[in-house]
Structures are given as C-alpha cells and as structure tokens.
Amino acid sequence: CLAAYLEPLVEANLVPLILTSDPAVASVAPYGGLDRVYTPNPLAIGIPGREQPMLIDVSMSTITNGTVGKTHAAGGKLDHPAILTGHGEISDDPEDYFASPEGSILPLGELAFGHKGFALGLMVEALTSALSGFGRKDAPEGWGASVMVMVIDPARFGGTESFLDETDHVARRCLDSRP
C-alpha cells in the first residue's frame, strides 16, 4: 500500500523511501526467537527511470498481518508455512498464530535466511520508532504508525541524467535476463 505514495515523487525524478512500523502491535518473531516483537515493518522505495519507474513495496516479514487475519477469518490455510507456532514449529495454519501459546510470523527469509529479514526489520524499527522518540517502550495502545519518509534528489549527488542512465541500465539488464 505504501507504493501509492511514491509515484508523484518518482515522476519528478526524486527517490522516495518510506518506512513504517506500528509500535502498538507485535506479530513478528526475531530470528532465532519465538515471541512477537515487532510488526512486518514495510518499506517502499521509488526508483525513477526514463522507460518505467521501479516501485518497490515489501514487508520485512514472510507475510503480513492482514494476510494472517484474512486467511484465518476465511478458515483457510496460508500458501506456505509462514507461522511459527508457540512451540517453535512452522505452520501454514493461521489458527496457530492465535493459539495459546501464541504463534508469530516468521521474518522475511523464514528459518533458513530469516536473519536477513530480521536485520531489515530492526533497521525499520530504528528509523521509525526510535528516531521519532515514540515506540514499543512506551506501550502505546491503538493504531499509531511510526513513519520515516526520506526523499533523495539525484541532482544533488552524481546528477539526474547519470542516475537515470544507471537505473535504466540495471532495469534493462533485469528485463533481458534469461528466464
């Protein structure tokens, strides 16, 4: 959903970066742990390009809170095991998230590479809640996102044209990659 905010800035050849967390909610376990500590902590970045911009909007967890809630309400199973049960087993059943002891969502990268998603989740926590001075330590109630927005002007660095040359080159290499 954060990607919707990127387009006007990208159209102006700016690079927006948006990070957000909700300090009132904990749903994702840290790598190697079972307990819920932070939220999926999405980040979005817009990368201008002459042909087509790149809009990236990803969470630092394997799935989102919304996916767990909607799948649970529908009585279904997740597409893949993304829940860590309260007993430390992985599961595709959202019921395990709501069970006692409560389950948690695995960080991006799951069990094998979850340390990477966990590290990125911590980065989002630091740049949102910690920088704002209002976070999990304050035990907030209700919805209250901590957000960090950064807008980078390539003209202030190596220049807009050079930036677009590079982003177009990388995008073209990706699109031309063999399937």
Residue ranges and their predicted role:
Residues 13-27, 125-143:
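Glycine-rich phosphate/pyrophosphate-binding loops
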Residues 14-18, 43-44, 52-55, 81-83, ...:
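Structural motif
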Residues 4, 40, 103, 114-125, ...:
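Conserved active-site and cofactor/substrate-binding residues in soluble primary-metabolism enzymes
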Residues 26-98:
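Phosphate/diphosphate-binding glycine-rich loops and adjacent basic-rich segments that engage nucleotide
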Residues 1-3, 28:
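Short glycine/serine/threonine-rich phosphate/pyrophosphate-binding segments
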Residues 76-136:
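Secondary-shell segments that build the walls of catalytic and ion/ligand-binding clefts
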Residues 6-8:
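N-terminal intrinsically disordered, cationic/polar leader segments
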Residues 126, 137-179:
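Catalytic-core signal marking the mid-to-C-terminal active-site face
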